[in-house]
UniProtKB/Swiss-Prot annotation:
Principal subcellular localisation of the protein: nucleus
GO biological process, alphabetically ordered: regulation of transcription by RNA polymerase II
Keyword Repressor among UniProt keywords: yes
Organism phylogeny: Eukaryota, Fungi, Dikarya, Ascomycota, Pezizomycotina
Record protein name field: RNA polymerase II holoenzyme cyclin-like subunit
Database matches in InterPro entries: Cyclin-like_dom, Cyclin-like_sf, Cyclin/Ssn8, Cyclin_N
CDD domains named in the record: CYCLIN_CCNC_rpt1
Gene Ontology cellular-component terms listed: nucleus
Taxonomic source organism: Chaetomium globosum (strain ATCC 6205 / CBS 148.51 / DSM 1962 / NBRC 6347 / NRRL 1970)
Localization annotation: Nucleus
């Protein structure tokens, strides 16, 4: 994998704004409005939840690691910014993105075995498909993604800050789950992986279960993170918002002081690529931040260990070059996703997908 996210095709070609994504999807719908009207689909978040579950199911049958599943989900999102969902058999695409991700993550699987497992899992929707169809779909997938197959994930950044922030095993487990869950949103197409990782850390700190409530872990365990969000309620969300607001206020105050001193009109290096490599930051600089600025960020003694850790995290953010506005957006998107998950109906989503597959003979 390429070490430098900032020089990667992911950053150059596969990071969009929300407005860009909305325009792309609208353009795909406008290509065949009759098809859209004839075969309505659930909202995109519910489709993402369903696709995530199916990738997890197929992966477990084969024994694949989380990294492979994550890469497959990114491929799926990229592909569906180029091709309308209703033009494809999603089960064939799910099989193919997982097959291709296995190759890229250096754990290749035989195409016949992958096809056999997929047909066993979705017999009514893939009964007419053979390995040749997966091979054809793979060619189309690579072509539509312009052979941009290297994917930078947030997991490495999360592991890189575990000791830095003194994260407990429960906090790491919850943060890992939040990262798993972000693949059911548009965040992999919107923000750099280190921003997602830091957002996951913040949410793990403020939504962390009590001592007698086990944290959720594992692949795609969004029920655990959603339950933690529900248990924390508005208080946990408010704590996250306050931490980000404090960090942003310190950044703005520092910028104003520099401007007043005649040293420049903005925060030096804010969002610069030099200090935001794949890990998102320099460990040495971050240690200095924690030791040097945390005292200034904590004017009074904090007795709650969790609140103290959140405040230290906010102080570190203020002294870093991390895009705090992007973290705010990530936080809002994830909280909104957990709320949306409450309305998810698996049976309805499956029926809507199967309806257009059968009607258009895409299962043959």
């Amino acid at each position: 994998m390429a070490a430098n996210y900032w020089e990667s095709t992911q950053r150059k070609h596969w990071q969009f704004t929300k407005q860009d994504l909305a325009a792309i999807r609208q353009r795909l719908d406008d290509e065949d409005p009759g098809l859209v009207q004839m075969f309505p689909l659930p909202q995109l978040r519910h489709l993402n939840i369903y696709f995530n579950q199916q990738i997890n199911r197929l992966s477990k049958r084969i024994g694949l690691r989380q990294q492979v599943m994550a890469t497959a989900q990114v491929y799926l999102k990229r592909f569906y910014t180029r091709i309308a969902i209703r033009q494809t058999n999603p089960y064939l695409v799910l099989t193919t993105v997982l097959y291709l991700a296995c190759k890229m993550e250096e754990c290749p699987q035989h195409i016949r075995m992958m096809t056999q497992e997929a047909r066993s899992l979705w017999p009514s929707d893939l009964h007419g498909h053979d390995p040749a169809r997966v091979g054809e779909c793979e060619f189309s997938l690579i072509s539509e993604m312009h052979s941009n197959l290297i994917v930078h994930q947030p997991y490495r950044s999360l592991l890189g800050v575990q000791d830095e922030f003194g994260l407990t095993q429960d906090e790491m487990s919850l943060a890992w789950t939040v990262i798993n869950d972000h693949y059911m949103t548009d965040l992999p197409l919107l923000h750099p992986p280190h921003v997602v990782a830091l957002t996951a850390v913040l949410l793990a700190l403020v939504l962390r279960p009590s001592a007698n409530t086990p944290a959720a872990g594992g692949a795609g365990g969004n029920a655990g993170a959603a339950a933690a969000a529900a248990a924390a309620g508005a208080g946990g969300v408010a704590m996250a918002a306050t931490a980000l607001a404090q960090a942003q206020a310190q950044v703005q105050a520092r910028a104003a002081a520099i401007a007043a001193a005649g040293a420049g009109g903005g925060t030096p290096g804010f969002g610069s690529q030099g200090s935001q490599q794949q890990a998102g930051f320099s460990q040495g600089n971050s240690q200095g931040s924690l030791q040097g600025d945390s005292a200034a960020a904590e004017p009074k003694k904090v007795t709650d260990p969790r609140l103290a850790k959140v405040q230290r995290f906010a102080a570190w953010l203020a002294d870093s070059n991390i895009d705090i506005e992007a973290m705010v957006d990530c936080t809002q998107e994830l909280i909104s996703f957990y709320e949306c998950h409450e309305q998810y109906n698996d049976k309805h989503t499956k029926e809507q997908i199967s309806r257009f597959i059968k009607a258009r003979n895409l299962d043959k």
